[in-house]
Every structure is written in structure tokens, then in C-alpha cells.
Design a protein with these regions (language model features):
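N-terminal maturation segment of proteins
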Residues: 6-591
């Protein structure tokens, strides 16, 4: 442009023209940014509404008031166990294509993070393909037949409509189980049915559930919840009628559904292979890699995972040896520690937020309820667990205590750190304070969630020492306890890879365990069988833990004296549950 035309324009007018031009361009750009972010948020909201309505349990546990988000409750259903792999792959690819259509550079940082997480999620889901035939909904520990009664028992009654939906759900257990039966028959025909050993363990659970139909624990819990209901409260007569109807549904719907499931599974006995890992099945190794990516959130080669696990195992072993060399009576001191930790679970949870202040950011609000597990459910549940609140109410945050006396007070303290502060409850509340988009609650990363809880559990052990009679002498003893737990989780993680990726059988696993002093044949067999039935489960906890540990080391090296532990934790919590490549990408921005 020939600038000479401006030579006679007064400077003040020229400056106004420039300001006006900049203002127009900024306005256009701003509208463009707003438009792209608005379009992206519309997409994620639509995705959330679609996913959250997949079944009544998902909707109820995620949203307390779906109507406020314009979501109409569908007819109560548990959904189906059957799926169309080709349709699922196609849908995931469509979502991936739509995500790539957004102008990434015009998205806000929060939306870019969500976009990165969703892209990786759908790309991974689409990679499953025909290997979805290896999915197993049943299992002695984490199977749907074991978890469903607990999910139904904990179904919150906020309104009378919730009670009505719950009762309708009981009538859908049978068709849901029938879809599982159909799936298991397909697996049997394809040579993918479970081993007789796993079958026996599942049947034992089913038979236990139906053994005493007139004294089923779900009846007791329902009556207890009705009595506590106050929106509005039921009369004694109405409570009695509802309890009678509930008992009828248990007798005519739920128990027959479990009996039919057990009978159908029994008819397939002998059609599966002996207890073996995924490596023995066609596509098994690829499916295992998919589990590591989708559940653990890691995309690191298996060989690299094994190398890191082995290094940690050696490091922990050397530290234990060093501690015992310095003080040979440390094990005796450790045995004393639990006796010195005389706090009740309530007192432990009250102490933890104060003890963790030096290492973790404080929360604005972290109210919670402590409840005791119903006596009839004690044998089915862990020593403590956290029940995530609906995303639209963010309350109640409930921690259940199972006082069955199966753990020492030190182990319970560590468990409460894992489930409460600074573990699951703390992480959930902290993340919610940033008001993330709803889809972030549905599409998450178990590796982040369980890895974080395991990572902070180590701090819980450290905090426990400060509550004992002689904190200084207790510190090393408690450190010994954590290192022992770390080594156990590491050993199980290596076995997980050995069984499902390297093809270890029971004998090879027993040899590996003997190297660490586990010589009891029945113990080795139980460890082997559990890991066969829960591929990748230990890695969610332990590989997740190591990712946080290594990320801390990387940040310490990069920032040097500027590294601040509390700030490190704050940034991880602000990013929230994502796959580890995404977490690492955004943590690199910390300078």
C-alpha cells in the first residue's frame, strides 16, 4: 500500500482510525473464539446427554435432577450386555471426526484439554473392534453379578419417583441377565467361555445370593431406606405395603434371575479353556493393550512398563534392606504401631485434612458423611469405600466403613487416606470446584483416579506416624509398611503382565512368587486365579501410582528450587482425570 496518501491526515484522527480498526478485528476474533467454544460445548453437552441416558443406574448415580438439564427420564432399565462392535467402532470414528473438525487453536484451554481427552478416548475405543468378544461382564470379584446388588442397595431415594424407578429396575434384572446369558453362549460357541474354576466361583456367589430368599439383605436395606425417607415421609402402613411389594419382587424377579443365570452358566460348563490369561486367546494380547490404554490410561510399550516396574521393585527392596540394617528391631516397632493408633474411623477422617495441609491445597468445602456398611453386606465389601455424588449436587460425599475387623488400624488409616483425604473424596471435590463440563465426569480415566488414590496413600502412612507415641521412631516403621505394600502391588502388576501378555501359566506364576518368599501353593493359586479374572486391574492402581511418582520427579528436575509440592498437586487436581499422555502434556506447561 502506498503510505503517501496518509501524509496530510492529522495524527489524532489516524490514531483513532487504528484503534477503531483494531477494535473491529478484536471483536471479530472474539466472536470467532466464542463461536467455536460455544459449538464445542454444544457438542459435549449433546454427547453427555446421550451417554448418561444409556441406563437408569448411570443416569441416577450421575444426576440427581436430570430434568434441570433438559433430560427426560427414560423408562427404567438396566440396558443390555449385548453390543454391535461394528456400530460402536463406526460411532467412535464419527465422534473422532467431529472432534477434529473444531478449530483447535480457537478453543479455550479447558476445551482443548477436553478435546484432547475425548480424541484419545474415542480413538482407543474404535481400536477395539472384533476383540470386544473378549469382554467379560461376569467375574467373582468385579463382575456385574457381584456388583449389581450393591448398586441397587445403594440406589438413593431422593423422591417418590426414585422409589418407583428402583422397584421397576428390579423387574428388569431378568431381561438384563438374559442378555448376559446370550452373550456367554456366543462366547462359548467361539471358544471364549470362562474356565470351570472361574465358573465355580461365580456360581458360588449366585447360589449364596439365592440361598435364603425370605431373608435377603436387599429387603432389610430397602426397609431401612424407606424409614429414613422424608420427601414426604411414608406412614407405617405405606412402608409395610411397599416392603411387602419389594419382597415379592425379590422372590419373583431378582432371585429367579440369579437362578436362571446360574443354571444357564452351568449348562456351558466344560466349554471354556483351563484358567489362562488373555495371551492364550486369539487377539488376546491386542485386547490386553486396549485394556491398558482404556482403563489405565497408559500408551507406553509393555516392555517399558515391565522395566519401570522392575526398577521400582528393586528400589523398594533396597530401601527396606537399608532400613532393617539400620534398625533390626524395626519390624517389632511396626507391630507396635497399630496398637498406638487407637483412633476411630471418624477421628481418622477428622485428622487427615489437617495433617495433609502442608502437602495439598485446602478445599473450600469438603463436607462428607460417614456411614457403616449394613451387617448383611460386610462380607462382600472392602474395609472402606467412597460413593461418588451426583455431578449436579456434588453431595452427599459418603464414605462407608466396613467394621468387619479384617484390617489393622494402620491399614485402615491408609485405606481412609485412599478413599477420603487426600484420596478419592478430596480429588473429586477438588475437581468439581473448577466447574468442569459434565462430559468430564462420564469420560474419565481409572488409571488417574486409582493411581492418585494409591499415590496419596503413601502420604497417609506418613501422616499416621505423626499420631503415634514416638513419631520419630514410628516414621521408619510406617515407611517399612508402605514399602511392603508397594512391593506387593508391584509384584502383582508384573504377574498381571506375565499372565495376560507373556502367557504365564499357574506353574510359572508360582515360580515367580517363590522368588519373593511366597511358597504356599494355595496362596499362589489364589493370586494367579484372581489376576486371570481381572486383567489390568492391579495396573490401574500401581502403574497409575508410578506415573504420578515419575511426573513429580520430572517436574522437580525441570523446576529445581522453584518446585513446590503443593502447587504440583494443585495443578494435577485442576487438570483432573485424564489419560496420562494428556496429563503430561498439560503439566509440561508449568514453568
Amino acid at each position: 500500500m502506498d503510505m503517501r496518501i496518509y501524509k496530510n491526515i492529522p495524527k489524532r484522527i489516524l490514531s483513532l482510525c487504528l484503534v477503531f480498526a483494531i477494535g473491529i478485528s478484536m471483536g471479530v476474533l472474539s466472536d470467532h473464539f466464542v463461536s467455536e467454544n460455544s459449538r464445542f460445548q454444544t457438542f459435549t453437552e449433546k454427547l453427555f446427554r446421550s451417554e448418561v441416558c444409556s441406563n437408569t443406574l448411570t443416569l441416577h448415580y450421575t444426576l440427581a435432577h436430570p430434568e434441570k438439564k433438559g433430560i427426560r427420564k427414560p423408562e427404567a432399565t438396566l440396558g443390555t450386555a449385548l453390543s454391535d462392535p461394528a456400530k460402536t467402532t463406526s460411532l467412535c470414528q464419527e465422534y473422532e471426526k467431529e472432534l477434529k473438525s473444531f478449530a483447535y487453536s480457537r478453543l479455550s484451554e479447558e476445551n482443548r484439554l477436553t478435546c484432547d481427552m475425548l480424541l484419545l478416548y474415542f480413538h482407543t475405543r474404535a481400536s477395539l473392534g472384533k476383540n470386544s468378544a473378549l469382554d467379560e461382564p461376569l467375574g467373582p470379584g468385579l463382575g456385574v453379578q457381584a456388583q449389581l446388588p450393591i448398586l441397587l442397595a445403594e440406589y438413593t431415594f431422593r423422591t417418590k419417583e426414585d422409589i418407583s424407578d428402583y422397584l421397576k429396575l428390579l423387574s428388569t434384572v431378568r431381561p438384563y441377565f438374559q442378555s448376559i446369558i446370550k452373550l456367554e453362549k456366543q462366547k462359548s460357541q467361539s471358544g471364549l467361555f470362562m474356565s470351570d474354576t472361574t465358573l465355580n466361583r461365580i456360581l458360588k456367589q449366585c447360589h449364596s445370593f439365592v440361598a435364603n430368599p425370605d431373608s435377603n439383605y436387599m429387603d432389610d436395606i430397602f426397609a431401612q431406606k424407606l424409614k429414613a425417607f422424608s420427601n414426604p415421609a411414608f406412614s407405617s402402613e405405606d412402608q409395610k405395603k411397599l416392603c411387602t411389594y419389594h419382597h415379592k419382587l425379590i422372590l419373583t424377579e431378582v432371585i429367579p434371575a440369579y437362578q436362571e443365570l446360574a443354571d444357564s452358566l452351568e449348562s456351558l460348563r466344560g466349554t471354556g479353556k483351563s484358567s489362562r490369561g488373555l495371551a492364550f486367546f486369539e487377539g488376546g494380547r491386542e485386547y490386553y493393550l486396549y485394556l491398558l490404554q482404556s482403563q489405565t490410561g497408559t500408551y507406553v510399550p509393555v516392555g517399558q512398563i515391565e522395566k519401570r516396574l522392575s526398577a521400582q521393585l528393586l528400589s523398594d527392596y533396597r530401601e527396606i534392606s537399608s532400613l532393617l540394617e539400620q534398625n533390626s528391631s524395626l519390624i517389632d516397632r511396626l507391630n507396635q504401631c497399630s496398637g498406638e493408633l487407637t483412633l476411630t474411623p471418624t477421628q481418622m477422617l477428622e485428622k487427615l485434612p489437617e495433617l495433609m495441609k502442608k502437602d495439598f491445597p485446602e478445599l473450600n468445602d469438603a463436607t462428607y458423611e460417614l456411614r457403616t456398611v449394613h451387617p448383611s453386606m460386610k462380607k462382600f465389601l472392602s474395609p472402606a469405600f467412597y460413593l461418588t455424588p451426583p455431578v449436579d449436587t456434588r453431595s452427599p460425599n459418603v464414605i462407608y466403613i466396613n467394621d468387619s475387623g479384617r484390617t489393622s488400624s494402620l491399614e485402615l488409616f491408609g485405606t481412609l487416606a485412599h478413599e477420603g483425604f487426600p484420596g478419592h473424596l478430596y480429588q473429586t471435590v477438588s475437581f468439581a470446584e473448577n466447574n468442569p463440563s459434565d462430559i468430564r465426569y462420564l469420560v474419565t480415566s481409572s488409571g488417574y483416579v486409582e493411581g492418585w488414590a494409591t499415590y496419596v496413600e503413601s502420604y497417609g502412612y506418613e501422616y499416621a506416624a505423626s499420631l503415634m507415641k514416638n513419631p520419630d521412631s514410628a516414621q521408619n516403621a510406617v515407611r517399612l509398611a508402605w514399602l511392603n505394600r508397594s512391593m506387593n502391588l508391584c509384584i502383582y502388576s508384573l504377574i498381571d503382565i506375565g499372565i495376560h501378555y507373556r502367557g504365564w501359566d499357574a506353574a510359572r506364576t508360582a515360580v515367580f512368587l517363590k522368588a519373593f518368599g511366597i511358597n504356599n501353593a494355595s496362596t499362589a493359586a489364589e493370586i494367579y486365579q484372581y489376576i486371570v479374572e481381572t486383567p489390568g486391574n492391579y495396573l490401574k492402581y500401581y502403574w497409575g501410582y508410578l506415573n504420578f511418582l515419575d511426573l513429580k520427579t520430572v517436574c522437580q528436575k525441570r523446576l529445581g528450587d522453584d518446585f513446590d509440592l503443593k502447587e504440583f498437586h494443585r495443578r494435577i487436581l485442576d487438570i483432573g482425570p485424564v489419560q496420562f499422555p494428556v496429563l503430561e502434556k498439560y503439566m509440561k506447561q508449568w514453568n
